[in-house]
């Protein structure tokens, strides 16, 4: 590999801000924040969603009634859109 052209690949702490869950992994992300974890200082990347807070992984996923949403849209805007050519 050529020297000086690759980003710094290092251990980084990713912290889910919605549930205060954090994990350490390796990444090339550039951050200004740092955090001390397990007695060592790591760069900190703040994220909004992780496997601890995403509804798919937590089992709190809702199934949306998309047909009902489409009908509601058509009722609201159908007269303004006019006829659709087939």
Curated annotation (Swiss-Prot):
GO terms for cellular component: ribonucleoprotein complex; ribosome. PROSITE patterns: RIBOSOMAL_L31. GO terms for molecular function: structural constituent of ribosome. Keywords: Ribonucleoprotein, Ribosomal protein. It comes from the Bacteria. Pfam families: Ribosomal_L31. One of its GO terms (biological process) is translation. The keyword S-adenosyl-L-methionine does not apply. NCBIfam families: L31, PRK00019.1, PRK01678.1. HAMAP family: Ribosomal_bL31_2. Belongs to the bacterial ribosomal protein bL31 family. Type B subfamily. Part of the 50S ribosomal subunit. This is Large ribosomal subunit protein bL31B. It comes from Cupriavidus pinatubonensis (strain JMP 134 / LMG 1197).
